[in-house]
Structure formats: structure tokens, C-alpha cells
């Protein structure tokens, strides 16, 4: 029986398989998750401003998303600024105010 309530179960299972996590990594503050369809989420934490972050898993191209948050180094800081630029498929460059740490996450497709 390959149907269930009008659904082709083989098609449904094949669709769900692409969301399976096939590889993970976690060491210190660096991590990644790779899904069967090539989707990759990776992130980490950086403590210096004005540096290039190299991805553990290179993306297919620059069509990925980066999100980030700043952690103040001192309680007297009253505002934050984060600039992400110079995107390549293997890295990105960021700047922020001195004394802050960056927690970042990138999401996109890698070549399998």
C-alpha cells in the first residue's frame, strides 16, 4: 500500500528525507549542521573586531544569510554597531565597536 489518506507515501517520505541532518559538528563556539539537500547552518563566536570569519563549510555561492548579535564587553556600553561585508562563498568580514563579541549564524546551500 503506497497511499495513505490520498497521499503517495513514497513521495512524502522522499520529501521528508531532504530535511534529515546528515552531518554535525560542534567544538568550542563553532558549529554546523548539514541537511540531506545541501542546506547548511553554521555559526560561532568571535572576540575581535575587524576580522574575516572563515566558514567551516564553504557555501555554493554568496546567496546565504548571516545573522549576528553583539555581546557588550563592558556594562557601560550604551549602543551597538555591527557591519557585515565582503561576502565570499568561504568567508565574510565584519566590524563592530571594540570590546564587543560577535555571535553569528549563516544559512544557505553548500555543494555536496
Which sequence ranges carry the predicted segments?
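A signal for long, low-complexity, Ser/Thr/Asn-enriched, surface-exposed stalk/shaft
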Residues: 1-22
Amino acid at each position: 500500500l503506497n497511499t495513505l489518506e490520498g497521499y503517495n507515501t513514497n513521495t512524502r517520505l522522499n520529501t521528508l528525507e531532504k530535511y534529515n541532518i546528515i552531518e554535525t559538528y560542534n567544538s568550542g563556539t563553532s558549529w554546523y549542521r548539514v541537511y540531506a539537500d545541501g542546506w547548511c547552518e553554521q555559526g560561532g563566536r568571535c572576540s575581535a573586531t575587524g576580522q574575516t570569519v572563515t566558514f567551516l563549510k564553504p557555501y555554493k555561492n554568496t546567496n546565504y544569510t548571516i545573522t549576528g548579535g553583539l555581546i557588550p564587553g563592558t556594562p557601560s556600553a550604551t549602543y551597538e554597531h555591527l557591519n557585515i561585508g565582503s561576502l565570499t562563498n568561504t568567508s565574510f568580514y565584519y566590524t563592530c565597536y571594540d570590546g564587543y563579541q560577535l555571535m553569528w549564524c549563516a544559512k544557505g546551500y553548500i555543494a555536496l
